Amino acid sequence: MIARAALACFAALLLAGCVALPPQTAALQARPPADLPARTERAEVPFFAQTRDHCGPAALATALADIGLPADPDRLADAVFLPSRAGSLQIEMLGGARRQGAVATRLPRELEALLREVAAGHAVVVLQNLGLDWLPRWHYAVVVGYDLAERELVLRSGTDKRATISLRTFEYTWARGGRWAITVLPPDKLPAMATEADAQEAAVGFERAAPPAQAALAYRTLLARWPGNLLAGIGLGNTLNAAGDTAGARAAFETVTERHDSAVAWINLARLRLDAGDAAGARTAAERAVQRADAAEPAWRDMARTTLAATNAR
């Protein structure tokens, strides 16, 4: 009797959870954003049916193919699928996209952000938990459309090329998956809804996997939206230098030092000027590096002084 009562109570809780609208869905339905299209679907997004537990490789292949990059789920499985986990971890999905030449960027944990990203023309890879918190069943899918009037999303999911799911159900499953969502885009494009911090993290991660010239393009793209981003400015200078464009690297670090009093930027500028035969300009930059390091960035003090000594030796 006690067991039956407990089971009945548990069932009632589940039913109550399914009936109630989750908060973000409720907000969207109560106050649909006036500037958000009521319906969008990108029917042209490719589809790769999932095989075995390979929803991660299939979803990643879908996103890569959508931007014209090589997309073979079987080959991607070798890179992102972990047999011991019978699935793909988020970090493997990010790395797999970057190794294929795409910038994978985290999106805000908001349902509206997903809809706006799709409205901007970008497929969105999401992680759902189709089970329960204590009995998870992880699943990757790709959001390719939505209909606010019908209150549903359109997904590339599993073996279904056009799976529809209610906003309510999706939010429950997405929330249980940590509200994880990414865009997979070429380095000359940014997600519509990414924050500066997430775009910066994505560019830095891309640099670790991409050729220097492609990484430089990603930093240029980020700087076009956030021109004052210090890390992106330094990253642009470093990747241009690694790509052999020393003149471009010097120009990049000159721009950084015009915006920021950064010891590492001054050090890099001094070295590039020295390599170009501009001893006087190098010395000026090195002196600024020492001043900044002494004043606020002691971690760079030794390198700044070493750089200054090198300029004095010329």
Question: Language model features by range: what are they?
Answer:
Residues 14-17:
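C-terminal motif of bacterial Sec signal peptides marking the signal peptidase cleavage site
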Residues 235, 268, 302-303, 307:
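Canonical tetratricopeptide repeat
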Residues 19-27, 149-235, 241:
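Noncatalytic regulatory segments and standalone regulatory/sensor domains
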Residues 232, 265-266, 299-300:
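TPR alpha-solenoid repeat register
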Residues 19-110, 114, 120, 188-189, ...:
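Cysteine-nucleophile protease catalytic domains, especially the papain-like/related folds used
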Residues 103, 107-156:
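Active-site-adjacent substructure of cysteine-protease-like catalytic cores
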